[in-house]
């Protein structure tokens, strides 16, 4: 019988892969804290309606890519394909629509039934940020600046470009929608089957189509800029001015669009050329209508999400694994003292390990194999004198220290 393998489109996070993954999450978490964001953790699966409302019944994600199932109680549940919907649902469920703004950071796995390829998995991981309850363009600029600061902290900001667009306000989009219907109706026969169906229900969804024949038509479709109201222009100007003031470079790209009605004003993507077709590493926009879709009041919001796998691939080097200290008892008579020292080191914040078997030589070999910085050797003679031998494994230097001085000494080196 062949050994079991990970399900297609999934992967194990082990060794260097996990080190890179953890570094992205920890870096983003630190930057989020500097911006005053609190971390939330929402369920990995939700009522299917949560995502049908957030993504739209006609979207590819809902119609083709969601992992949905009926539980034993007959409820339709879905593994989350993205993080924003769950955050907005949690905001309403927990009665936080009266305590705004809320700044939310999250990280975790998402699930979509897509064709696996480089940088794209069926179980993938995201970091994300949602700033809920602020309608001003400065909020959008702050969210974007935070995303760029995450990329800077990861050392990859210079390899990405911020593409920025406006989707206007409700009045702007209504006029734009009418123009799009007229345009796509004239070339209806050239549209894909999916887009012909969307033309009847939500023509903005055609703008998100990945079908080659649709992409060619979308390229020549009317653009929102011709339909912006004075209020939408003012918001757009305010956002660009704030980004300039914050020192966040961007390029205007009218091709950055969102197909759902509750999206408006800001849409953006940080893209790179290093990952080929999967070049978007962090993207977001303003979604003032989504909280209302979850049963709450109409609430302004701006957010983004970044793919951890893609961000990990851009890191120049794998972060160094933490190195432990190895406690090495020299003889069974010293084992009790070695265990006490082991626990004292851990209590003092020092990563420490002990080999469960073997003579002194074997234990030292294992200490080198696990990359220990120091070996703390303690035998019956050391126990009797209340000392230990602390050996630096990188250069072989050795010092004798009192037992109660070992932990402060090694903690100081680690700090």
UniProtKB/Swiss-Prot annotation:
A Pfam family reported for this protein in Swiss-Prot or TrEMBL: HGTP_anticodon
Main localization of the protein described in the UniProt heading: cytoplasm
Any one cellular-component term (Gene Ontology): cytoplasm
Disulfide feature: none
UniProt catalytic activity: tRNA(His) + L-histidine + ATP = L-histidyl-tRNA(His) + AMP + diphosphate + H(+)
Alphabetized SUPFAM superfamilies for the sequence: Class II aaRS ABD-related, Class II aaRS and biotin synthetases
Protein keywords: Aminoacyl-tRNA synthetase, ATP-binding, Cytoplasm, Ligase, Nucleotide-binding, Protein biosynthesis
Subcellular location field: Cytoplasm
GO biological process, one term: histidyl-tRNA aminoacylation
EC number: 6.1.1.21
Subunit structure: Homodimer.
Family: Belongs to the class-II aminoacyl-tRNA synthetase family.
Protein name per UniProt: Histidine--tRNA ligase
Name of encoding gene: hisS
